[in-house]
């Protein structure tokens, strides 16, 4: 069925400065453990060369998920342009039970039709398992590829795809008038642009649940301040600029509240603002430091970091009252948690034996699995479907972004070429 591809990224507009030194995914390990799949180069039905390698985008997305291992193009037994041309036996002989084929066709008005078919080459040979077609302008061809990837991924795994999502992060460059930049890119590092430039540090970007805004910390006024920036027009709303520390913003899943940490009374404590009224209420109290809030799906409970037991550990508290409950017990310290959208697990920075890695904790059983193997890992952020984590780690004298699957098998890097990259935040579905 043909459908016009909806333009979900309304903030890709003229004020956004597109960058050339983009991050790119470099896979370190885990692809071989994925399910084999065939992704054929999409047939270009037009003159000259195709404007975009859609098949390559789909193959890269499926590979980057850690759940699939696309067959190398040099090993493809055939290159069919449609489902009818697929020879199932040729693929099943290589252990492949599903193949993606597609076509890209130019239209007289300058747009393109992008179509794909997912073909069964195993249990029901030749059956079309999923198919779709999108009409898009040239600048949306990559998005069309990610859309096809999302649909193929969901059909084969039962999990909603997250290939149309984005990541926000802070880049610190050397020198210049504005050495700190808040940037946004596609999840795979493409289409990067600057949201805000500053002569002073920027920290802790957090997405609104509809993907239209970013909250972050800025020091441009001479002290820390929390602001919310609307991506479509660049409008900035100041949320908090109290004496001492203002930090760690986190939007509630229902979009009505913003949690953050303030030290205006001396100790660092959690506060929640009602975004409609601007009213702020204090959630935690005491002499301990309480920070790094992350919401549970009900928008009523927070996980957060506290040193009330001596070393940092993760606790849970209801924003309407009640004593915080400690929820991490393994490792010498645990902090900076991010709760999954279904509330079943969280990822966090876990330290033990002098090592600081990203770990996953089952919130029902308390079981902990260390996911990463990089150095001085920080600030984990979950993909909205809970399958991947992006985080920063130290490499040489700098900081880079890394990806790891939540089963720990797939690992990749997103090395930048023009600065240190910190504070990654994965967007919601867009």
Curated annotation (Swiss-Prot):
Keywords: Cell cycle, Cell division, Periplasm, Signal
Range of residues in the leader sequence: 1-21
Chief location: periplasm
Cross-referenced Gene3D superfamilies: TolB, C-terminal domain, TolB, N-terminal domain
Classification via InterPro entries: 6-blade_b-propeller_TolB-like, PD40, Tol-Pal_TolB, TolB_N
Positions of transmembrane segments: none
Annotated localization: Periplasm
GO terms (BP aspect): cell division; protein import
GO cellular component terms given for this protein: periplasmic space
Presence of keyword Oxidoreductase: no
Function: Part of the Tol-Pal system, which plays a role in outer membrane invagination during cell division and is important for maintaining outer membrane integrity. TolB occupies a key intermediary position in the Tol-Pal system because it communicates directly with both membrane-embedded components, Pal in the outer membrane and TolA in the inner membrane.
Oligomer and partners: The Tol-Pal system is composed of five core proteins: the inner membrane proteins TolA, TolQ and TolR, the periplasmic protein TolB and the outer membrane protein Pal. They form a network linking the inner and outer membranes and the peptidoglycan layer.
Similarity section: Belongs to the TolB family.
Protein's name in the database: Tol-Pal system protein TolB
């Amino acid at each position: 069925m043909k459908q016009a591809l909806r333009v979900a990224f309304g903030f890709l507009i003229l004020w956004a400065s597109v960058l050339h030194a983009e991050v790119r995914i470099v896979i370190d390990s885990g692809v071989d453990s994925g399910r084999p799949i065939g992704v054929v180069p999409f047939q270009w039905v037009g003159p000259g060369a195709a404007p975009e390698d859609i098949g390559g985008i789909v193959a890269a997305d499926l590979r980057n998920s850690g759940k699939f291992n696309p067959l190398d193009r040099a090993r493809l037994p055939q290159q069919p342009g449609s489902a009818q041309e697929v020879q199932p036996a040729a693929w099943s002989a290589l252990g492949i039970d599903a193949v993606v084929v597609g076509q890209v066709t130019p239209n007289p008005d300058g747009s393109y039709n992008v179509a794909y078919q997912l073909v069964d080459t195993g249990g029901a040979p030749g059956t079309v398992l999923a198919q779709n077609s999108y009409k898009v302008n040239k600048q949306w061809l990559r998005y069309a590829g990610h859309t096809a990837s999302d649909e193929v991924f969901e059909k084969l795994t039962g999990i909603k795809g997250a290939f149309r999502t984005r990541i926000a992060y802070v880049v610190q460059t050397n020198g210049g008038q504005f050495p700190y930049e808040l940037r946004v890119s596609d999840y795979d590092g493409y289409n990067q642009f600057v949201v805000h430039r500053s002569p002073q540090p920027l920290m802790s970007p957090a997405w609104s649940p509809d993907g239209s805004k970013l909250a972050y910390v800025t020091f441009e006024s001479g002290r820390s301040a929390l602001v919310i920036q609307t991506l479509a027009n660049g409008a900035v709303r100041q949320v908090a600029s109290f004496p001492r520390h203002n930090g760690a913003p986190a939007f509630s899943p229902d979009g009505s509240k913003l949690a953050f940490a303030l030290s205006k009374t001396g100790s660092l404590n959690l506060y929640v603002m009602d975004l409609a009224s601007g009213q702020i209420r204090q959630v935690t109290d005491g002499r301990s430091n309480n920070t790094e809030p992350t919401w549970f799906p009900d928008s009523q409970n927070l996980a957060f970091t506290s040193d009330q037991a001596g070393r940092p550990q993760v606790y849970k508290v209801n924003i309407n009252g009640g004593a915080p409950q400690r929820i991490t017990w393994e490792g010498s310290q645990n902090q900076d948690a991010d709760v999954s959208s279904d509330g079943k697990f969280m990822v966090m920075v876990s330290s033990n034996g002098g090592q600081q890695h990203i770990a996953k904790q089952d919130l029902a059983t308390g079981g902990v699995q260390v996911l990463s193997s990089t150095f001085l890992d920080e600030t984990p952020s979950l993909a909205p479907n809970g399958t991947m984590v992006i985080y920063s780690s130290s490499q040489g004298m700098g900081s880079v972004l890394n990806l790891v699957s939540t089963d720990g098998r797939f690992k990749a890097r997103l090395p930048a070429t023009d600065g240190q990259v910190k504070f990654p935040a994965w967007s919601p579905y867009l």
